[in-house]
Amino acid sequence: MKGRQIANEIDRVGLRLKLRKAQAEAGDIALLFADESEALTHPYLARAWAKRGADLRVPAPGQSKKVAMMGVLDWLGRRLIVTTSRSKRSTDFITLLQNLDLLYGPKPGIRVKPVVIVLDNGPIHTSKATLAALAARAHWLTVEWLPKYAPELNDIEVVWHDLKAHHLAHQTFSDPETLDAAIHQAVAVLNLERSRHPLVNQRISA
């Protein structure tokens, strides 16, 4: 797409998402925004201070290792749901979908809302395995595809920043297992914050 086409597509999808949010507010659907991120065992520096001209050093022994985070934001419920792994592959995203089966999927004798999940066109979302997994859930899960170059349309991006800048920042983790546990604890704290304080996602960025 050329520049004008991209802008038009972003506007079109942005309007569709406004309509989806209205549907969620009316109780007609559950609206989920999905994406991946990662955290490192070395410190994430949300902010730092040093005298002018000083060489700022942060202790970070060894080689930094990462933990991948697969997540969805329940837009109306304001809840972040995260699974962790050592990689960001289609199989890891499908594991997240399997968790959504338990939380949002059909259950015998229970009426559940249709679910709309917002996804970008990243390779793990458009692989054959992932598309097959999404197709198998098409009777209750609808995908809204984001255009390329439009992270601003994915509401989970702000929450990822909040998680890393306010809950995981300025810490060194001894190994991926310790970081993994810290991620899940941080998600629990963040969700508690967001349930108590409706404007917490509007705080000033670090």
Predicted regions and their residues:
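Short, basic alpha-helical/linker "hinge" immediately adjacent to a nucleic-acid-recognition surface
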Residues: M1-I6
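C-terminal anion-handling pockets and recognition modules
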Residues: D28-I29, I156-A206
